[in-house]
Amino acid sequence: MTMTHAQNNHHARLIDGKQVAADVRANVAEGVKARIDSGLRPPGLAVVLVGEDPASQVYVKNKTKACEEVGFLSQKYTLEESTTEEELLKLIDTLNEDNAIDGILVQLPLPTHMDADNILERIKPDKDVDGFHPYNLGRLAQRMPVLRPCTPKGIMTLLARTGVELRGKDALVVGASNIVGRPMGLELLLAGCTVTITHRFTVNLPAKVSQADIVVVAVGRPGIVKGEWIKPGAIVIDVGINRRDDGALVGDIEFNEAAERASWITPVPGGVGPMTVATLMENTLYAANHLHKD
């Protein structure tokens, strides 16, 4: 009886993504200062935005602001919606050859007349600070990561902050996108977890969630994972960010119900989101220090 009572009063500890991201950015700023103090140039990040998608404009603003805060050289290229794929590829070629630029970021989604895969593959792998290039995903799959996809790597930083040993844990990734789900599975595998990735053809999602010590959900559908499915004591990471009809921002997981069962949980907003940009800064500094020696 007491145990049930204790469990009912249980509330997960929050993983504060804002705080961890601030720590990561402070470390990057120190690294930039050390570079400049030793006579090297500041790391450079080029951000390319095509068209006028409002969400993309906000993301680009956040990224360029973060660049300036840590002392990077930040170059922003805003192209018309009507820009041809050929013109964008030409810009990428120019940035690939620019020694002041360590990272090239093309903000997604791109207009429908462009082949995003073709464009992302044109970025030199050693400047692919988003970690989307097949070369970088392949390195991660072969256990020799160089530039790692930002959101999964940021989540690994959050998991490290819990102090929980990841080896041997059963980890479940809900959602199999190229940007989050698949590389997330590879990151957890690298950390010694036993990994399951679920997708639209998965049968009996609740049973799979209820077995998992670590649950990472990245689907973009509010409440797709019910709180009652969570295994007591699990670590819950919510990558989703959805706007409800009443204007509230919510994740993919039923937060309040999940927080009653989990040991650790990320809030939305203020969980995974800030880590993506902080990790982009980390990757750009890494590229400057280790991949570009000029």
From Swiss-Prot:
Cross-referenced Pfam families: THF_DHG_CYH (PF00763), THF_DHG_CYH_C (PF02882)
Pathway: One-carbon metabolism; tetrahydrofolate interconversion
GO annotation terms (biological process): L-histidine biosynthetic process; methionine biosynthetic process; purine nucleotide biosynthetic process; tetrahydrofolate interconversion
Keyword Oxidoreductase: yes
GO CC field: cytosol
EC number(s) from the headed UniProt entry: 1.5.1.5, 3.5.4.9
Domain of life: Bacteria
Catalytic reaction annotation: (6R)-5,10-methylene-5,6,7,8-tetrahydrofolate + NADP(+) = (6R)-5,10-methenyltetrahydrofolate + NADPH; (6R)-5,10-methenyltetrahydrofolate + H2O = (6R)-10-formyltetrahydrofolate + H(+)
UniProt binding sites for NADP(+): G175, A176, S177, I241
Molecular function terms, GO-annotated: methenyltetrahydrofolate cyclohydrolase activity; methylenetetrahydrofolate dehydrogenase (NADP+) activity
SUPFAM superfamilies in UniProt: Aminoacid dehydrogenase-like, N-terminal domain (SSF53223), NAD(P)-binding Rossmann-fold domains (SSF51735)
Keywords: Amino-acid biosynthesis, Histidine biosynthesis, Hydrolase, Methionine biosynthesis, Multifunctional enzyme, NADP, One-carbon metabolism, Oxidoreductase, Purine biosynthesis
rRNA-binding among keywords: no
Assembly notes: Homodimer.
PANTHER family in the cross-refs: C-1-TETRAHYDROFOLATE SYNTHASE, CYTOPLASMIC, C-1-TETRAHYDROFOLATE SYNTHASE, CYTOPLASMIC-RELATED
Task of the protein: Catalyzes the oxidation of 5,10-methylenetetrahydrofolate to 5,10-methenyltetrahydrofolate and then the hydrolysis of 5,10-methenyltetrahydrofolate to 10-formyltetrahydrofolate.
Family: Belongs to the tetrahydrofolate dehydrogenase/cyclohydrolase family.
Record-given protein name: Bifunctional protein FolD
Lineage: Bacteria, Pseudomonadati, Pseudomonadota, Gammaproteobacteria, Oceanospirillales
